[in-house]
Amino acid sequence: MIQLDHVIYGTSDLEAAADRFGTEFGLTALPEVGRHPGGTANRCIAVGGTQYIELLTPYGEGAIGHWVRRRIADGDGWLLWSVTTDALEFEAARLGLEITEGRVTHQDGTVGSWRSAGSTHREVTRGGLPFWVCYDDPDGTRPEIWGRRLAETDCGMPLQGMAWLEVGIARPELQRWLGSDAAIPVRAVNSARDGLLRVAVATPEREIVIS
């Protein structure tokens, strides 16, 4: 099954970005700062289920950190989006993608790991297409963990996941990438700017739209 997983917002200042999401949108970032070997650090905002918004900033040296630094040279903004699948090998083979491994070190010393495909593809790094991810979760505890994380945030309203994404990309290209059976709430639009444009988080009473 293919499902929307998370979206990535690039920032030069994690704390300032977390404050902005809290003040403007009522979305509370988790306090923990994760650090990645590729030269980035993050804070996450749980938005329902296992979905989340990742605030990502360059940290130290590393190829990914340098890429993020270039992308946000003109200001903070949306970078990437991802989908999760339990058939990563199949999707990677179908699209001719290499599978790579990733990990994050949490502040308590534990390490989270995953495998992904497509994160270096040109159309993905422009933000139009999603990269694929499959988490290492042998005990099946990931939904429970994200449930606790959501409970830790004080947003003042129930969050029900991402209602939709708006992406500047041609719909046939997106359909070819995801496959005809994928039911992902993505609006492909004609835009002067490629990539992720807007994200809507669902609540019982309204949608929180973030540009």
Language model regions located:
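Anionic group-transfer/hydrolysis microenvironments
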Residues: I8, L56, D136
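Glycine/small-residue-rich interface belts in oligomeric ring/scaffold proteins
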Residues: S12-I72
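General secondary-structure edge motif
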Residues: M1-I2, F25
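Vicinal oxygen chelate
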Residues: Q3-S12, R43-G48, I53, H66-P158, A182-S211, ...
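Short, surface-exposed linear patches
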Residues: F25, P31, Q51-I53, W67-R69, ...
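Amphipathic alpha-helical segments
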Residues: E15-T28, F90-L95, A170-D181
